[in-house]
Amino acid sequence: VVQSFQNCMRENDIAPEDVVFVAHSTTQATNAFIEGDVANVGVVGVAGGGLEGFLAKRQLALKDIVLDEKVGRMIKVFNTFIKKKMLTEEVINKNIDDLISQGAQVIVASMAFGVDSMDEEMMIHDCAEKKNVPVSMASDITKLYGLTRRTRTAAINASILPKMMATANATESS
């Protein structure tokens, strides 16, 4: 991990003082995750039609992610699905608004075969970003094939985004 950070800093001409907040915010986000201080996640799933869409819709519909069964800590997950041919800014914005009205605080964009083309996930990302809603793209988080696994990984990551960003911003402004 250290070698990766050093390579990244060297290759991108990043000064060490510019990265201090990353470690702190990541630690705080990890602590928040362990303690269950996580954001509710809205998943915007996308797939083509026919059998692909039928199967993907089921794989994209995540259940709440249990963090600690004994005390009931979980990541609350809300789901919506858009057929690829219906994917427009207007439709995306309506679906994001619906997820937010249900209680989602962050958005995950996930598409069947998204690792092969991230364009559709990027459309969702851009719409959420314009609304100032934290967003994570499943295919950007992991290149694993396996729609449910990729989406779940992105949902877990997205659930700690608000805490991580708040800590990073607080650290940077101090």
Model-identified regions with their sequence ranges:
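N-terminally biased helix-coil "hinge/interface" segments that flank
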Residues: 1-174
